[in-house]
């Protein structure tokens, strides 16, 4: 007999032996087994009261703070600002792929595709915070790349500052950089 048949037979026997029931008695009443714990009995549930909660102490009419203004300090909407004169030309095809994003000191990933979505192309982020979490599409407009949320509103824009680098801002004025 060949050795491989012996090994195969032993493996089958060992596997079947492992499938055998243990000697533990699941119907044990505890008299023979000192480690047996009886099951817990169901307890009645008290009735539930319903009603409006009182407002917290010192609360105003709204529990949420007011939304920040859409314009940056100085009254200029940063996302609608024109690119600098030193901005390089950009094509849609050169943007496709994975980008490393630096947004206000935090890093995350951005993925850009050529799949049509509304007036732009599909895109998304992973690990980002703030406005970039809502990114759903992007498009090239002149020398700028616009990032849009799922509603189609521009949430940020960048311009090409070097061969594999883009710089710009989000609508809230946070600095935004893309690099490969």
From Swiss-Prot:
Q: How does it sit in the membrane?
A: Lipid-anchor
GO CC annotation: cell outer membrane
MF GO annotations: endopeptidase inhibitor activity
Q: Where in the cell is it found?
A: Cell outer membrane
InterPro entries assigned to the protein according to its UniProt record, in alphabetical order: Inh/Omp19 (IPR021140), OM_lipoprot_Omp19_bac (IPR010571), Protease_inh_b-brl_dom (IPR016085)
Per the UniProt entry, the signal peptide is 1-18
Predominant location category: membrane
Please report the name of this protein according to its UniProt entry: Outer membrane lipoprotein omp19 homolog
Q: Which organism is it from?
A: Agrobacterium fabrum (strain C58 / ATCC 33970)
């Amino acid at each position: 007999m060949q050795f491989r048949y012996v090994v195969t037979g032993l493996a089958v026997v060992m596997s079947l032996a492992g499938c055998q029931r243990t000697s533990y008695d699941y119907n044990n009443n505890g008299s023979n087994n000192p480690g047996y714990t009886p099951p817990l009995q169901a307890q009645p549930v008290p009735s539930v009261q319903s009603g409006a909660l009182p407002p917290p102490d010192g609360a105003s009419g709204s529990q949420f703070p007011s939304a920040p203004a859409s314009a940056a300090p100085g009254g200029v909407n940063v996302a609608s600002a024109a690119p600098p004169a030193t901005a390089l030309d950009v094509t849609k095809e050169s943007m496709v792929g994975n980008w490393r994003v630096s947004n206000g000191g935090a890093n995350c990933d951005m993925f850009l595709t050529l799949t049509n979505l509304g007036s732009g192309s599909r895109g998304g982020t992973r690990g980002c915070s703030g406005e970039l979490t809502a990114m759903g599409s992007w498009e090239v407009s002149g020398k700028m790349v616009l990032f849009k949320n799922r509603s189609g509103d521009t949430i940020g824009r960048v311009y090409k500052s070097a061969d594999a680098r883009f710089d710009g801002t989000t609508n809230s004025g946070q600095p935004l950089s893309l690099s490969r």
